[in-house]
Amino acid sequence: MRKLMIALALTTTLAVVAAASAALPHPGARYTGPTNSKVVNGFGNTVTFLAGARTLKRFSFGTLGCFGYGTFPVGVDPYSTSLAQLTKSVPVTAKGTFAVTSTPANWSGGDSDTKLKVSVVGSFSSATAAKGTISVTETGANGSCGPVKMTFIAKLGGQ
């Protein structure tokens, strides 16, 4: 009987630990953080998204594209004038991983002929932090380029 109780306690403990190790975001919360993109004029790049129960919504980040973005006037944040936002939500698994492949993004940079396809892969290391990689491919009148990759660490409520 004693061995049965020990085995039951051990099994229950392992099940609780396994369930607790799956880090999921807080639904309705905003996550924001820096990317490893090059700092331009003192301005860094940021990623931001809203967490749903099993999706990341309004996933956005700055990108200068891969064809080049022109000049960067002093005092102007080039990433804020060149935001990309995914047109669909990014699914989150029960284990806290997330991924979307080659999805279109609305982009405020470039010209109207330039289109972005974005892939995002990452995971939540806790309910308050996620890290991942964003890959951007650009297609326009001059052909296509990419992928340009950047990594990010986003935290609950901000940087």
Regions found by a protein language model. Name each.
Residues 17-24:
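Sec/Tat signal peptide C-region and signal peptidase I cleavage site
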Residues 7-15:
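Bacterial N-terminal signal peptides
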Residues 31-129, 133-143, 147, 152-159:
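Predominantly extracellular/secreted and cell-surface proteins with exposed
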Residues 1-4:
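Positively charged n-region of N-terminal signal peptides that target proteins for export
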Residues 24-32:
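A glycine-anchored, Pro-Gly-centered beta-turn/N-cap motif
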